[in-house]
Amino acid sequence: MLLVSQGANGGFMLGPSLRAFGAYLIFLLFPLSALPQRQSFTVGTASAAVGEKSTGYLEVPAGVDAATDIPVIVINGAKPGSVLALISGAHGTEYASIIAVERLITLLDPAQISGTVILLPLVNIQSFEQKVPHVNPVDNKSMNRFYPGKADGTQTERASFLITKQIVDRCDYLIDYHGGDLDESLRPYAYWAPTGKEAQDRVSKEMVLAFGLDHIIIWRDRPTDLGATRYLDSTSTARGKASIVVEGGYASTVDEDDVALLVNGTLSTMRALKMLPGDPRPIENPVWFEKTVDVIAEGPGIWYPLVRRGTYVQEGMKLGYVTDYFGKRISEVRAPVSGVILHINAIPSLKKGDNFADIGVVVSHAP
């Protein structure tokens, strides 16, 4: 057994046995349990150990109005990695997107995941249960218009504040899911909001392409003031997190093709982010839009659309007409610009300020 030998320069060297003994001594003094270990990940009342899945609630406390609980799921992957937030149901009758995120709860296996996934499948429970489109019926506010929220505000503002602190501030990436509400006949599309920050924009563009929706709006004028970001994705983007918005489903229907589109897009995006094994399936030649133009009703009446979602229209083309309550035609609605009908009002009911249609204006050069 050689513990020490003399080196060529006259010094002494540790022999292999002594080196082995030293390693053993270090092991005794510093056992593996003393090394940094991955911890449980907790959001609200959901706490998942490594390799586990947990459900719970974000508990929004009572304030000027009632308290509410928002369902939350934490999937803490078996391998280390990034944190991804998947959030839907800000508008509780955009059902296809809600069902898609709910389906992901069971599909995502923590054993396959690198990193952590936080899912909020249904932010606006009151809207969902009472079948009220667009707003939270408790305070009549959209749950995607009051970010970053207020700790002492109304229920929508308090919920937005909690989501910002508990999820947005802790995630690396975020996907915000929406779709066609009760009155919106919508064709699937996504939003990509470049910031001018090369690294962040590169990742968010990779995400939106990996998701696979073939129509993408370039949103360049998202709010950037951290205290008034308004939208969920703007709140995340302004804080340096790569984020996208995806839209699928029309007029509150739950079409399996729309649900599958959102589910498969999420899995592909997770592969692009190296959070799931396998290769993403990015869309290769999407249609890019430089802006959207809303067509707004000037007064009430009964709406008769003449075009469908996804139709390409020329400026001046008739989109539909409006009658009074006696059947008399009182106005015709024409396209103010040329572009694609991303969604069109799906129901006859009409009041002043309603949106007849949303037209996407195609870019001259893809980004």
Predicted regions and their residues:
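Bacterial N-terminal signal peptides
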Residues: 22-33
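Ala/Thr-enriched low-complexity intrinsically disordered regions
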Residues: 8, 20-23
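Structured catalytic-domain cores with a bias toward divalent-metal coordination
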Residues: 5, 14-18, 35-367
